[in-house]
């Protein structure tokens, strides 16, 4: 405007209203029809810079709204990053990678003494190193299309080799002057320094229905959200349809033979393994994050899903309903091969068998309490974003009618000698209708779930 260019004010205001209407609170915009990092590297980034450079002068009311939404980021979004600052592999366009931390850097625009700018910069610098220090990051001196290295399952049809440079949005932090608190604060670990070991911490975004969980024992962050049908079919892919996403365990793609990690797959009427794609939020109560889901090709195959984050993993209490027999599989997170072959073992504690895999960095263990017929170690090739070879623990069963599946999905650092980590539960009780459950944990806590 200052240069004499004409602006269609009515059209501009219409677009601004559409953007603001997508806001769901706690820093999250809805990238219709799904939540993902576009809330951060698009809505929040553009909203704050537009307000700063243009909106405050010409559209102050809209700028005020964008900046009010932007101010909510430090209260929630930093918790989505691991203790060491790593980001979670989640959502479309993940090849933009470190661009996810740009709004944390731009909180410097607020110059708010209550913001821990050392934590914001710690995350920003750590996400840069997360990728620049990975040996597979570059190919022909250009960042690969993937997460760490090239990884086709994570790529959308609109992406090309040049798409990766969206990650450069993080360097918009250089817009901040040298005397800005973002540049002058001492980097630190933020809230992680206050977290206690053997506890779990959850941040719930009530209107967005996003649950972020932090695990001090291994320094991991984790995310749960919902999905819905989209004409673009984004909801069909692993970027969105995992049960949860973890900073330490990037998602593994599904295999044609039923290989599955952190999701359910069902053999459909065509004889193909079909993952869950539609997750509808039900409630977050007494620590349980509850959703319902259904098979897209046959909505009569219906799931009630409940997850309770624990200090060293997840307790799942799920109910599956199907009018006819169906084969069902569900997996833990997968481990990439990092230090030689992945070690496999079976540990028996308190009458329960725990299948354990160990890649020299982490151990993952899965215990079936109820419902499952068997567990197995499943080897995969070229399904994991961080290694050609990987292993996952899968459980399987043939379900008809209504059936409850209770599963512990646990973890620890490799080298730990404490096998008690594999059984944090004393007992689980439920009524005849299997609609009410009481979980007694070994730390004395009691949790209740009611469907």
Predicted regions and their residues:
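A contiguous, well-structured "functional interface" segment within a domain
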Residues: 25-59, 222-224, 233-294
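Terminal, non-catalytic domain-edge segments
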Residues: 107-114, 123-130, 134-274, 417-424, ...
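Extracellular polysaccharide-recognition and catalytic grooves
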Residues: 2-189
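Contiguous hydrophobic segments
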Residues: 20-21, 57-74, 117-124, 170-195, ...
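Extended repeat-based interaction scaffolds and adjacent low-complexity, acidic/S/T/P-biased segments
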Residues: 252-254, 258-451
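A residue-identity detector for tryptophan
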Residues: 28, 41, 50, 90, ...
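Generic structural hydrophobic/aromatic packing signal, biased to beta-strands
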Residues: 19, 77, 104, 131, ...
């Amino acid at each position: 405007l200052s240069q004499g260019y004409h602006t269609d004010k009515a059209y501009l205001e219409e677009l601004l209203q559409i953007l603001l209407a997508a806001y769901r609170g706690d820093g999250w915009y809805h990238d219709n029809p799904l939540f993902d990092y576009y809330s951060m590297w698009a809505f929040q980034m553009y909203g704050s810079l537009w307000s700063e450079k243009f909106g405050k002068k010409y559209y102050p009311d809209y700028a005020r709204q964008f900046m009010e939404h932007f101010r909510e980021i430090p209260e929630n979004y930093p918790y989505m990053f691991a203790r060491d600052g790593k980001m979670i592999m989640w959502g479309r366009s993940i090849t933009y990678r470190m661009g996810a931390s740009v709004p944390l850097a731009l909180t410097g625009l607020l110059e708010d003494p209550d913001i821990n700018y050392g934590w914001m910069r710690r995350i920003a610098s750590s996400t840069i190193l997360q990728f620049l220090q990975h040996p597979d990051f570059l190919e022909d001196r250009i960042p690969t299309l993937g997460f760490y290295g090239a990884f086709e399952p994570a790529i959308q049809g609109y992406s090309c080799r040049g798409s990766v440079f969206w990650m450069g949005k993080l360097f918009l932090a250089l817009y901040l002057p040298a005397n800005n608190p973002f540049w002058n604060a001492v980097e630190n670990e933020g809230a992680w320094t206050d977290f206690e070991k053997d506890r779990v911490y959850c941040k719930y975004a009530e209107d967005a229905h996003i649950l972020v969980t932090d695990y001090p024992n291994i320094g991991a962050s984790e995310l749960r959200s919902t999905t819905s049908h989209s004409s673009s079919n984004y909801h069909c892919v692993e970027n969105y349809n995992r049960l949860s996403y973890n900073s330490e365990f990037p998602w593994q793609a599904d295999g044609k033979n039923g290989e599955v990690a952190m999701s359910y797959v069902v053999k459909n009427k065509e004889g193909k393994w079909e993952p869950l794609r539609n997750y509808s939020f039900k409630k977050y109560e007494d620590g349980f994050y509850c959703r319902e889901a259904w098979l897209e090709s046959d909505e009569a195959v219906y799931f009630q899903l409940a997850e309770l984050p624990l200090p060293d993993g997840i307790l799942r209490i799920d109910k599956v309903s199907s009018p006819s027999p169906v084969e069902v599989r569900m997996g833990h997170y997968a481990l990439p091969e990092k230090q030689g072959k992945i070690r496999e073992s079976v540990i028996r504690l308190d009458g329960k068998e725990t299948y354990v895999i160990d890649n020299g960095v982490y151990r993952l263990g899965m215990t079936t309490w109820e419902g499952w017929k068997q567990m197995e170690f499943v080897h995969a090739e070229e399904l994991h974003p961080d290694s050609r070879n990987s292993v996952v623990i899968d459980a399987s069963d043939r379900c008809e009618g209504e059936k409850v599946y209770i599963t512990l999905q646990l973890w620890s650092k490799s080298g730990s000698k404490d096998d008690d980590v594999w059984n944090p539960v004393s007992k689980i009780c439920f009524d005849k209708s299997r609609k009410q459950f009481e979980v007694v944990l070994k730390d004395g806590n009691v949790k209740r779930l009611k469907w």
